[in-house]
Amino acid sequence: MKVLVVMAHPRRDSLTGQITDAVMTGLADAGDEAELADLYGEGFDPLITPADEPDWGSVNKSYSHAVQTEIERLQRNDGIILVFPIWWWSFPAILKGWIDRVWNKDIAYGSKFLSHKRALAIGLSASDAPTYAKRGYDTAIETQIVTGIFDFCGIADGRFEYLHGSTDGGERPALLLHEAR
């Protein structure tokens, strides 16, 4: 399987970056072909422009060169993995902007849907699982991404995995890396 791994963190040497590397290694070890999209590292601009807004009157929309390049990258893969820290109970703005600009009408929803077989979101959380459950954040974030994005765009096999305690010291980072593999 060809898998697009999208990382959304400003520091490549962060735990999010290390988890991304572990995911890439795990995919290669499983015989899958992984392609990395490091949104910050590549300088992706998350701001949508009029050129990239959905065109509700046409199914033959032309997008900016930057977005068309991302669409092609998205479409040449069979699966997608999003790796990101959870900030303010959601994913980073750069990832939201990437989805807004690239997962566009008649690309990911509308007259056409994504053809990806599977999608996985890996969210790194500083808080523990009981904190998320107590306030309902766990189901809210999962519903937003799995149902509101993956399923809405035609990816029936989508799931969300939390890696809790990402800012805990000691052995926790090593345990999270092991879990990611």
Indicate where each model-derived feature is located.
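Short, conserved beta-strand edge motifs with alternating hydrophobic and charged residues
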Residues: 83, 121-123, 160
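Generic secondary-structure boundary/loop-capping signal
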Residues: 41-45, 111, 152, 160
